[in-house]
């Protein structure tokens, strides 16, 4: 329920400000979610929800880059660094609290925790 509320909030913000999202370059949003392992269904559901939200506001300037955290803090940091190398400054996730422990190393990224 908590994840659903946060996703709905993000969607609501995107829908209310579509003019601010229209830009000459792509807006890149990273996703740190479990796409393998025991929690892969949660991750796949979040990816699908975010993509539906982007389609709902009909903005082709937004690109979503999902990365698999495998539900592991070390893998989460690795995935976040990969997104950072792609010059992605906004990341939604990670899903699990335990995966937050190393992310303070990445000061130039804005995380929206689920």
What are these regions (language model features)?
Residues 2-14, 21-114:
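Extracytosolic ligand-binding ectodomains
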């Amino acid at each position: 329920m908590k994840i659903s509320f946060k996703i709905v909030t993000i969607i609501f913000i995107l829908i209310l400000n579509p003019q601010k999202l229209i830009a000459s370059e792509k807006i890149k949003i990273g996703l740190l979610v479990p796409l393998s392992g025991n929690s892969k269904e949660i991750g796949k559901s979040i990816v699908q929800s975010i993509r539906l939200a982007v389609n709902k506001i009909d903005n082709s300037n937004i690109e979503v880059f999902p990365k698999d955290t495998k539900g592991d803090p070390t893998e989460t940091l690795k995935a976040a660094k990969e997104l950072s190398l792609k010059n992605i400054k906004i990341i939604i996730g990670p899903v699990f609290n335990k995966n937050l422990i190393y992310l303070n190393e990445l000061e130039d990224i804005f995380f929206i925790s689920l």
